[in-house]
Amino acid sequence: MNSICDPGDEVIIPEPFYANYNGFALASDVNVIPITSKIDDNFALPSIHEFEKKINSKTKAILLCNPCNPTGYVYSQEEITNIANLAKKNDLFIVVDEVYREFIYTDTKHFSILEDEKFSENAILIDSISKRYSLCGARVGFI
């Protein structure tokens, strides 16, 4: 978060979310602005209007986990595209944690933010080798 945020900046994250996001934000003095997804909607992304209400001058990014940890919900191409368009329109980063993209147990197809080149200037993809190669506990970063 330090590479895209200054102390006091904000990152919008749909909740429930991976608990360590709070720790990462706290370590960077960044404020997490939660936006609640609901079990009644199978944890789909809230409406764009709900995100728009959270954006202000301190907002620097929207962070998604796709598939979502802990809900397992896989965001659709439409959901990813809509939220990425909102980020682009507001000159925000769209940070997408795709660590679990190979762990989908339905017919739902995973759509990566990087599949659409128009978002490349705003997109940051988070990935890990620990899940894919069964290297749990390995703390290896790569760019």
Q: Predicted regions: what is each one?
A:
Residues 1-10:
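Phosphate-binding glycine-rich loop
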Residues 15, 34-39:
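Short beta->alpha connector loops at strand-helix junctions that form conserved
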Residues 26-33:
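A short helix-loop-beta submotif of the ANL/AMP-binding
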Residues 115-143:
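Active-site PLP attachment segment
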